[in-house]
Amino acid sequence: MSQFIIRRSNDILSKYLPIKYEHVVFCHLSPFQLALYDLFLRSPAIARLLRGNGSQPLKAIGILKKLCNHPDLLSLPDDLEGSEELFPEGYKPGDRRHVAVELSGKLSVLTRFLASIRSTTDDKIVLISNYTQTLDLFERLCRLRRWGFFRLDGTMNINKRQKLVDRFNDPTAPEFIFLLSSKAGGCGLNVIGANRLVLFDPDWNPASDQQALARVWRDGQKKACFVYRFIATGSIEEKILQRQSDKQSLSS
């Protein structure tokens, strides 16, 4: 039987899986994020793009998306000219010794959420991001808070990935957080040891997000599942969410 694969879609399995709750969590940008966001939108680079003279629209989109996660994902002040005038007192770009949680609206919400899960439940949770830089932030946060975690991204050897997932799925494992790159593992990665999942940033392709959101809601799951999509309000992430909705309505 090991030579064969049983192909079953979620349409079939959903009849036998526990209930799944999906939530969209809208988070305000921090004052620092908002100031940087406004600075970039008013920059000469964006003005050139709006006039049709710019040659790097994808770079601009990338800056906005990273800024929605945390200012530390950018190379400041190089990525945003003049941003050093907006730095909060004591802020040091690129400081890897700690995580400035308060400088990101989404990370502030996530930190309080993880602390609540840890103290009030025995649930495990998967944290997914499109950026390994965001996973680096999560990892530093977990180490500082002494939260047990595993991490899987594209740099991990394929042979080691399933072993790591199996360790996390073991109910006796003390680690309650699984850090996952959205593109790692393909369609077959089942992290059923967790029944909660946070998608920290959206992808333009709704199929990619749906695949990521289904990691915990797979065959073998015994508990009710909760998935949370974090969206920075008033930002490019709302536009991405809107585009996803439009694409899904066209395909349905």
Language-model features, listed with the residues they occupy:
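Short, flexible segments with low predicted structural confidence
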Residues: R7-S9, F113
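Conserved Helicase C-terminal RecA-like lobe
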Residues: K15-Q33, L41, G52-I177, S181-G185
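Short amphipathic alpha-helical interaction/hinge segments
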Residues: S9-I12, R48-L49, C68, D72-S75, ...
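SF2 helicase/translocase ATPase core recognition
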Residues: I6, L13-P44, K160, F176-S252
